[in-house]
Amino acid sequence: MAAPVVSGLSRQVRSFSTSVARPFAKLVRPPIQIYGVEGRYATALYSAASKQNKLDQVEKELLRVAQLLKEPKLAASILNPHVKRAIKVKSIGDLTAREKLSPITTNLINLLAENGRLNNTPGIISAFSTMMSVHRGEVPCTVTTASALPEATLSELKTVLQSFLSKNQVLKLEVKTDPSIMGGMIVRIGEKYVDMSARTKIQKLSKAMREAM
């Protein structure tokens, strides 16, 4: 029973990808593949924007849409499943006109409204942002410490982390504090994960002592 739904979605996405770019061209693949409904729409959007050299513009517009969707009044009118689709389409039309969004972004939002998939909008925006991050060569890195690092230590840490990247990659660093790790740090960079926290060291020591007894 699920096959017709998936097939219909595929047709809609392909139609969107080509509806804003003429002549019809081969789909431009994003630098990273994201699955699911959000991934399909984001891929089509990336392809359409890439063909018109408007990736940066579309990304900025989507970030603006994401901000607008956080407004309680707007969210209640277009994300509420009990609101009639026709009303949502009208609200979206007013929004895109007021914000003067590009045809690419407007077509996406209108398509989501017409197909009853506006609730997928935040996920689609997130997927597109991930694609753009990889497109720019950004490598996400999260460093968690028990307390805030001094500026000198943070600067040295950035230099060390950057040394692990290739020349065309850019470090996108996020620093968090979590007193529960007790000391040391936890580093997640790309797909690599290194736990050097005092908490983990204590847990390993405790386990080793129990096994030795």
UniProtKB/Swiss-Prot annotation:
Out of the domains of life, which is the source?
Eukaryota
Please classify the protein's predominant subcellular localization into one broad category: mitochondrion
Query: Is Membrane given among the entry's keywords?
Result: yes
GO MF annotations for this entry?
proton-transporting ATP synthase activity, rotational mechanism
State the compartments where it is located.
Answer: Mitochondrion; Mitochondrion inner membrane
PTM notes: In response to mitochondrial stress, the precursor protein is ubiquitinated by the SIFI complex in the cytoplasm before mitochondrial import, leading to its degradation. Within the SIFI complex, UBR4 initiates ubiquitin chain that are further elongated or branched by KCMF1.
Subunit field text: Component of the ATP synthase complex composed at least of ATP5F1A/subunit alpha, ATP5F1B/subunit beta, ATP5MC1/subunit c (homooctomer), MT-ATP6/subunit a, MT-ATP8/subunit 8, ATP5ME/subunit e, ATP5MF/subunit f, ATP5MG/subunit g, ATP5MK/subunit k, ATP5MJ/subunit j, ATP5F1C/subunit gamma, ATP5F1D/subunit delta, ATP5F1E/subunit epsilon, ATP5PF/subunit F6, ATP5PB/subunit b, ATP5PD/subunit d, ATP5PO/subunit OSCP.
Q: Enumerate the PANTHER family for this protein.
A: ATP SYNTHASE DELTA CHAIN
Similarity section: Belongs to the ATPase delta chain family.
Supply the HAMAP family for this chain.
ATP_synth_delta_bact
The identity of this protein, by name, is ATP synthase peripheral stalk subunit OSCP, mitochondrial
Protein species of origin: Sorex araneus
Give the gene symbol. Answer: ATP5PO
